[in-house]
Amino acid sequence: MTILAVTWIGGGGANGAEAGVKADGLQEDIGTAVYAVHRFWSDHWSDYFPGRYSPPRVLGSYDGRSPYRPACSGYKVLPYNASYCTSQHFIAWDINLMRMSYTYGDGLVYQVISHEWSHSIQNRMPPRYLVPQIELQADCMGGAALAGASRDGTLTWEQGDNREIAATLRGLSGDTPWTNPRDHGSATQRINAFNTGVRYGVRACLA
């Protein structure tokens, strides 16, 4: 089942038995997530922050096993990770992380992209809104963006989405850099932060 879908894309999904169908579903979900999160912040930046919205450059998927993967400030991005590069204002993710998370369902694909997009928002919003736990704030803002996109009609949020994301975070906790509790917080902390954003919106995530 496609857990989240942009309304103009419609169904399609990740329930196909063939690997090719699953790959198509993953790429569709990635594209959907990018569109929905960008659309939310484009429409609502001025509701929360002064100035103009500046979306990150989307480098998209890379293969973390490749020596030719992207670099940020001279350092190669990590395998099984997703990143926002502050100095170059881009986001990118290891396709292998997305494939790993997809075994649990497609929910975490949306969280990964909304989380990294939130880091780009943190980099451009006034510093007074930052909190010390920037990773948990990004989880909160990511949840707010996805829920906001659902309220706007850009995204369809189905029953059980939050539970699916929670199960994926617990299942992958400590297995990848993106789910490393030392850097990002425990699975429980991340789930609580994400759900705060979903329930109460962007303002609940800000200092």
Show where each model-derived region lies.
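A metal-dependent hydrolase signature that marks the N-terminal structural subdomain at the beginning
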Residues: 1-71, 203-207
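Polar-ligand-bearing catalytic/cofactor-coordination segments
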Residues: 86-95, 100, 140
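Short pre-active-site segment immediately N-terminal to the catalytic Zn-binding motif
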Residues: 95-111, 126-132
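Active-site-proximal beta-strand/loop segments in catalytic clefts of secreted hydrolases
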Residues: 61-64, 94-97, 113-117, 122-126
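Extracytoplasmic/secreted envelope proteins and their assembly/folding machinery
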Residues: 27, 31-38, 42, 94, ...
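Long, well-structured alpha-helical subdomains associated
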Residues: 150-207
